[in-house]
Amino acid sequence: MVVKFTKSEALHKEALEHIVGGVNSPSRSFKAVGGGAPIAMERGKGAYFWDVDGNKYIDYLAAYGPIITGHAHPHITKAITTAAENGVLYGTPTALEVKFAKMLKEAMPALDKVRFVNSGTEAVMTTIRVARAYTGRTKIMKFAGCYHGHSDLVLVAAGSGPSTLGTPDSAGVPQSIAQEVITVPFNNVETLKEALDKWGHEVAAILVEPIVGNFGIVEPKPGFLEKVNELVHEAGALVIYDEVITAFRFMYGGAQDLLGVTPDLTALGKVIGGGLPIGAYGGKKEIMEQVAPLGPAYQAGTMAGNPASMASGIACLEVLQQEGLYEKLDELGAMLEKGILEQAAKHNIDITLNRLKGALTVYFTTNTIEDYDAAQDTDGEMFGKFFKLMLQEGVNLAPSKYEAWFLTTEHTKEDIEYTIEAVGRAFAALADNK
């Protein structure tokens, strides 16, 4: 059991003097779980972390998804080391980027052409630009609660109803930009249709997380994505899948392969980098040929396609091609789900658990979670207490009630068994303090 965080606390105090908020991404702070110093990690191996105090954790954060093969996987580490020895950045084309592009195309047939960038945010941002260039329209649609990076156009909250335009969801986002975005509830065909009836002739594209990962793991209702394609295409707009979280997470071909629905454009990130910074986007040939140097939609990047990220991505996909890995993730996910639900029943703790294969979310509520409103209406205070109890048990989760638990190919049945026991102890403590 973890008993001290002395060095993490001291390091956070020092970080506050030099780094804004003491963290380089707000999701890493403990603000959403009652405050305190976030735990600073020193190294990772396989399914485990060790923090600066020497405490060991079973890791279900997986860096918010990218580390599907576990920390410091030897095949990926070797590829990165070799790339570094040969020079990490040239500013020229390389054989590695061609090889990696071919691998992505083979995995995801919707990608006629691809382009590499440096993050999921960049990938989504550029697909929007390309869609606007192709359609000659300006407005974008998105689903409430779905995160598509931190560019201005996607940091927009819903207006007062499905037929109203958005409002800025961050300081620094002009109202003029928010007016170009229509936000509708996920899994609700009627509100989507209502919005398209009013604004469809101005819409360039709709952004879709085909399986939601940003207010927990939420699957589309049967037929929902097919209806999205139908209605959006009838309006003359494009469908963009944000598969930054989902690609290569649930199966090798991404959510579009798992669900059997094809978008016009796809944004990728996270898993495809094997842990290094990366993004990519791609789609139909006639749409992608809008991108410079072939077309008028400009996008460039000094670090785009850098050899280290390309080598890491290739190695990661090579690991994921091994037979049985996704079946293992599903099996362990099912085992973890069953155990958590049994512990909740044993200790009379109200939860809803959403799981898809090797990813799940535990919500402190009895309600079904199918959209963002339902996810918001869950007990964040209870989650914060649970999070800190699990940290004391040596189990690392994301510090937010909205985030997923991600399994890696390196987790074992013994890890799952220990985690279930830890959940039981945490639930017992919560029950005692009701």
From Swiss-Prot:
Molecular function in Gene Ontology: glutamate-1-semialdehyde 2,1-aminomutase activity; pyridoxal phosphate binding; transaminase activity
Catalytic activity: (S)-4-amino-5-oxopentanoate = 5-aminolevulinate
EC assignment: 5.4.3.8
Pfam family, one: Aminotran_3
Keywords: Cytoplasm, Isomerase, Porphyrin biosynthesis, Pyridoxal phosphate
GO cellular component: cytoplasm
Cellular localization per UniProt: Cytoplasm
Residues modified as N6-(pyridoxal phosphate)lysine: K270
Pathway: Porphyrin-containing compound metabolism; protoporphyrin-IX biosynthesis; 5-aminolevulinate from L-glutamyl-tRNA(Glu): step 2/2
Entry cofactors: pyridoxal 5'-phosphate
Keyword Cytoplasm: yes
Family matches, as InterPro entries: 4pyrrol_synth_GluAld_NH2Trfase, Aminotrans_3, Aminotrans_3_PPA_site, PyrdxlP-dep_Trfase, PyrdxlP-dep_Trfase_major, PyrdxlP-dep_Trfase_small
GO biological process: protoporphyrinogen IX biosynthetic process
PROSITE patterns for this protein: AA_TRANSFER_CLASS_3
Family assignment from sequence similarity: Belongs to the class-III pyridoxal-phosphate-dependent aminotransferase family. HemL subfamily.
Binding partners and assembly: Homodimer.
NCBIfam families noted in UniProt: hemL, PRK00062.1, PRK12389.1
Descriptive protein name: Glutamate-1-semialdehyde 2,1-aminomutase 1
Protein source organism: Bacillus anthracis
Lineage: Bacteria, Bacillati, Bacillota, Bacilli, Bacillales
Name of the gene: hemL1
